Amino acid sequence: MIAQTPPMGWNSWDCYGAAVDEPTVRQNAAYMAEHLQVFGWEYVVVDIQWYQPTATSHAYEPFAELTMDEYGRLQPAPGRFPSSAGGKGFKPLADYVHSLGLKFGIHIMRGMPRMAAHRHLPILGCGKGCHEVANPNSICAWNPDMYGLRCDMPEARAYYDSIFRMYAEWGVDFVKCDDIAREYPHCKREIEVISDACRACGRDIVLSLSPGPAPLEQAEHLKKYANMWRITDDFWDEWRLLKGMFERAEKWCVHAAPGHWPDADMLPVGALRQCYDQNGWTNFTQAEQRTMMTLWCMMRSPLMIGGELTKNDDFTLKLLTNRDVLAIEKTSACAHPLWTTEDESAWIAPRRDGTGLYVALFNLSEETRTVRVTGEMLEGTYSEASELWTGEKLHLADGVTATLGKHDAAVFWVE
């Protein structure tokens, strides 16, 4: 089974929108291999519109000419990804990423290009044309590129088979499929068809569904057909969004397990929005970034870095390479909140090996606050604790206590 632990990597969206190019992907991959890989970071993911030759930002150019082959399958734009020229697709770039010991991922939109349907291009491996399988009534509300498919037709599966076999030939390890996770009920069958094509392509590919919020009542369906799915709309560097994530995390945490992970979205840390401002930087304070990383790790969300890695400062690099905090993702089980109020939250997660607990304390208020979990709440006798951000060792008398500045967090290994 793939995705036995939450996937960890980098995604180009937060820093480059639709405009990332091959040199940028390569430099981020090289940085990951040198500075992050040893800590568990491994996926390098090219986000939306890699097939659009003139993309420049997070905005979409309406009805732009897209790069695709004779079967209506999108291809990397050679002007942005030079190694793809001559029909090579993403294979040369994926080969480079693999040569670093990393894994390569791409973003796709559900469906097929509208251009492919309008031009009546054939579907590889069957007798139907794209125009016969495309559903013009199934379109994305925020991107103009695609039509959904008539998934009651076997030729819809043939189209998805053709693109996933191509991704497998390229060496793709991760596919983020967009405009689908929150589109229940009308995209339920399309999720199943995409998942089946992904699993039948001959290569292990992690399937991630976006955007959120995915409906909680569809949790079992999502767990059956995807490896991760978004529980929120796009998450950005705003405190109100981070504070709101505590409610979502509480609802979804029980569904986190090997092979399927509720996804709280990317980590907007470091250098963001580079397509607009080369000096762009996260609006989160250092305290808020600790809170975000602590919550994501406690709920065992996938971790995808959103910033331009080569511009990481010392704080950002240390935030992303704290072995003890990152270990929560791989060694804990059954994480859940003890409580969450307007002003504070406390989470607990036993280690799978039974050797102790992780305890996270959060100050959600606008002033310094002391947050305490009593020994009775821990449901056991524990005498020692280590705070994982600072390394401070504590002797416990009755529970765990931390005095935290506004929007800050502490996380303890208790034994």
Regions found by a protein language model. Name each.
Residues 376-391:
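Solvent-exposed beta-hairpin/edge-strand motifs
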Residues 396-415:
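C-terminal beta-strand-rich structural cap/linker in extracellular carbohydrate-active enzymes
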Residues 131-138, 151-152, 158, 162, ...:
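Glycan-recognition surfaces
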